[in-house]
From Swiss-Prot:
Residue stretches of biased makeup (Basic residues): 24-39
Entry's family note: Belongs to the type IB topoisomerase family.
Protein's recorded name: DNA topoisomerase 1
Catalytic machinery residues: Y725
Basic and acidic residues bias locations: 1-23, 40-110, 131-168, 181-200
Organism encoding this protein: Rattus norvegicus
Function, in words: Releases the supercoiling and torsional tension of DNA introduced during the DNA replication and transcription by transiently cleaving and rejoining one strand of the DNA duplex. Introduces a single-strand break via transesterification at a target site in duplex DNA. The scissile phosphodiester is attacked by the catalytic tyrosine of the enzyme, resulting in the formation of a DNA-(3'-phosphotyrosyl)-enzyme intermediate and the expulsion of a 5'-OH DNA strand. The free DNA strand then rotates around the intact phosphodiester bond on the opposing strand, thus removing DNA supercoils.
Cross-link (Glycyl lysine isopeptide (Lys-Gly) (interchain with G-Cter in SUMO2)): 103, 105, 119, 136, 150, 155, 160, 166, 174, 206, 338, 551, 644, 702, 714
GO annotation terms (biological process): animal organ regeneration; cellular response to luteinizing hormone stimulus; chromatin remodeling; chromosome segregation; circadian regulation of gene expression; circadian rhythm; DNA replication; DNA topological change
Misc. remarks from the entry: Eukaryotic topoisomerase I and II can relax both negative and positive supercoils, whereas prokaryotic enzymes relax only negative supercoils.
Main location: nucleus
Tagged with keyword Ubl conjugation: yes
Oligomer and partners: Monomer. Interacts with ERCC6. Interacts with TPRN; TPRN interacts with a number of DNA damage response proteins, is recruited to sites of DNA damage and may play a role in DNA damage repair.
GO cellular component: cytoplasm; dense fibrillar component; fibrillar center; male germ cell nucleus; nuclear chromosome; nucleolus; nucleoplasm; nucleus
Amino acid sequence: MSGDHLHNDSQIEADFRLNDSHKHKDKHKDREHRHKEHKKDKDKDREKSKHSNSEHKDSEKKHKEKEKTKHKDGSSDKHKDKHKDRDKEKRKEEKIRAAGDAKIKKEKENGFSSPPRIKDEPEDDGYFAPPKEDIKPLKRPRDEDDADYKPKKIKTEDIKKEKKRKLEEEEDGKLKKPKNKDKDKKVAEPDNKKKKAKKEEEQKWKWWEEERYPEGIKWKFLEHKGPVFAPPYEPLPEGVKFYYDGKVMKLSPKAEEVATFFAKMLDHEYTTKEIFRKNFFKDWRKEMTNDEKNTITNLSKCDFTQMSQYFKAQSEARKQMSKEEKLKIKEENEKLLKEYGFCVMDNHRERIANFKIEPPGLFRGRGNHPKMGMLKRRIMPEDIIINCSKDAKVPSPPPGHKWKEVRHDNKVTWLVSWTENIQGSIKYIMLNPSSRIKGEKDWQKYETARRLKKCVDKIRNQYREDWKSKEMKVRQRAVALYFIDKLALRAGNEKEEGETADTVGCCSLRVEHINLHPELDGQEYVVEFDFPGKDSIRYYNKVPVEKRVFKNLQLFMENKQPEDDLFDRLNTGILNKHLQDLMEGLTAKVFRTYNASITLQQQLKELTAPDENVPAKILSYNRANRAVAILCNHQRAPPKTFEKSMMNLQSKIDAKKDQLADARKDLKSAKADAKVMKDAKTKKVVESKKKAVQRLEEQLMKLEVQATDREENKQIALGTSKLNYLDPRITVAWCKKWGVPIEKIYNKTQREKFAWAIDMTDEDYEF
């Protein structure tokens, strides 16, 4: 029985393949014949179609009965399938003729939908497929046998095509997905940036819009992680030797560490200064063992060359690091910043300015400091005082150590403090300049200076009257106050001899620091100042003064030696007390702030031209800023690369001039062509050349403005006055009034520092 079934199945399959080959050969001929006979047989085909539909309904009934019978019997009749396969071709031809060109619409009206049509593909046997526009889709109506008979081949082809279609769609989907992802990324990136910017904007603490704390209270809650200590000393490699008197000498770890501090500075001018060398050697010997002290008795016999070369090589290696190595270091620093660089103050995350404690090294000081070269010792946890709120988590000290003290003082702004060993001064870890505490302090400073504006005329009248006082102390105070007001001099603090550099302020002026000229350069009553100011920067100025001031100075200098104090009956304490009596909160610094800010405002009004472009306006701003820096004696040494950078800038200017000359020639030539041709095309060319010339002129102007700006400010430090003495609201108002982007005046850090001023100021602000 099973053998018969196998025989029947193989016979059916063979017949099927034979019929299938006949079908492909006759396919195109049948189509052509149908196309020709289409019009003649139209009515006949419709009748056949109707007849076919009625037959289809009958076949469906028969099919249902057969299906019921099959389910009851539990098997299918394979012999009947064999006869049906033999008659396949005949039925196929009848079905195609019956279908004809019957419309889909009509088929649906007859109560059934057409089965899926078989895709016709051109064969490789030399036949040409008829034009698509001439062929109407064929619908295969079902006859009485078609309901229960479907050739295996057709079914297999349909399934394969369906699978192929799905696979193609999936592949297309996979190919398209990256594009969609890229598009999504491109769309998402700006959205993410906007969201991030919006989130940052929301996170910014607009403390200036909140109610201020009671007087003296700085915060209500403060929590932080404490300081980051300098890494421990790493001994030098065995190959790096120290020589004393031409012989190799192995140093103890402590002595070696201090020796490396000197070796790192070997090429610096500091190591040639006698005071530096003397202080270093004295402190270095304190770190030596007894044997080392007995051996090393002369610094000149010490050879630090190999140490110095080793550190230079280390420095060069850091410069030559790969991107991956630099990125790794950057990530480590960012991780450290994230953990230690922020604190929580009154439920807001605030940036800490200097969370790393300075490593040990050699003290340099400002100017010719008498303690330069001394050893700055390593700061340990036992030196540290922590300040935080009582309900905050106290930062943990490094393992095996403890803090010197933990305080909960909300009347101070520092987080960590310690005492350094050189000057005995207290050092602090404070918040970033963009923090609320620093911002409030700045705001108060400028508001105090604005209050001075209301009473400055009264104060000036007062000190003018005091020039005539019978008391020498009052006269000296009045002249000193005149200098502080007119010249923006610092008050000058009293200093212990030998403890700090010999810098001078108003109250500490000596007779040797001034020269009096009844007439100089066509001006009367000129005072010539020449003294070391803050950071040992020389203050040199020739100033015409009022006659009574000049006469008083002559009086103050009578019978005095050059090293004697000019104001021998005055000190900073007496002066500051007098200033407080004149106005609450008034100090010499308030006078400097007032004069600096008012000078900037006046200079901007004088120098800014409404019709200037943005680069020219920026030059005007820098010139106004320069006037303030000169007033406050904010000088600097010209940068080492100044000459080279100016040469590079001049080369750019020369190249731009050549480009402009060529562009002007092109414009002239285009205008000549336009006169001859007189057509729209040449007119467009002329306009294009004009725009090119204008663009190059603007670029040249920018470069020339930049060169002028650099030259004028090569020895002037604009940043000091901009950050510390100029009310930022003056700058913000000027930018808003004249359409100058604030980014052109303040960098990102400065914008964060002055966020309060940028937010609250409009263009009508007056200091």
